[in-house]
């Protein structure tokens, strides 16, 4: 899909954000499957029900941010599903953003809004929005 490639090329840091069960992972995997670039899927949420294209490398275990940095150097598009499982702070997110920007890569991060919060009227959303090049919100 040419439109998705264009969106992925123009945005270094993309957040897919929403409450649990709002198809965030489906959107991220669809973006990955639509590109022919070297890509990887960091599947921290143990999603086994998705059909991932054979050319996409899947990692199910990640120990720390250094592994993500290595993925950024090795792949053009990196999908992390979902970031809260790594307990990465905002300074580390900014560091990752700078790295993908400098290397002209795309990092797609799935982030979950707590079910007891409003989708966009919370501090977590505001923090992510300030550093994202693109926010994709899901709400049903």
At which residue positions do the language-model features occur?
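Conserved P-loop NTPase "ATPase switch" module shared by AAA+ and STAND
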Residues: 71-89
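N-terminal pre-Walker A segment at the start of P-loop NTPase domains
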Residues: 1-7
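Phosphate-binding/switch region of NTP-binding enzymes
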Residues: 112-140
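Conserved catalytic network of the ASCE P-loop NTPase/AAA+ motor domain
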Residues: 8-9, 34-35, 70-73, 98-104, ...
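Conserved P-loop
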Residues: 8-70
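Structural motif
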Residues: 15, 77-81, 108
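Substrate-engagement module of ASCE P-loop NTPases
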Residues: 90-117, 129
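Conserved nucleotide-binding/hydrolysis micro-motifs of P-loop NTPases
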Residues: 45-48, 84-86, 113-118
């Amino acid at each position: 899909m040419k439109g998705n490639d264009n969106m992925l090329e123009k945005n270094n840091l993309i957040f897919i954000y929403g409450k649990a069960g709002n198809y965030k992972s489906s959107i991220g995997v669809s973006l990955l499957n639509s590109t022919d670039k070297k890509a990887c899927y960091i599947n921290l949420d143990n999603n086994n029900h998705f059909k991932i294209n054979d050319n996409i490398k899947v990692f199910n275990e990640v120990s720390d941010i250094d592994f993500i940095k290595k993925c950024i150097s090795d792949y053009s598009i990196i999908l992390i599903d979902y970031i809260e499982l790594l307990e990465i702070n905002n300074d580390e997110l900014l560091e990752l953003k700078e790295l993908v920007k400098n290397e002209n890569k795309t990092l797609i991060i799935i982030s979950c809004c707590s079910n007891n919060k409003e989708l966009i009227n919370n501090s977590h959303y505001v923090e992510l929005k300030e550093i994202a090049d693109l926010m994709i919100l899901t709400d049903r």
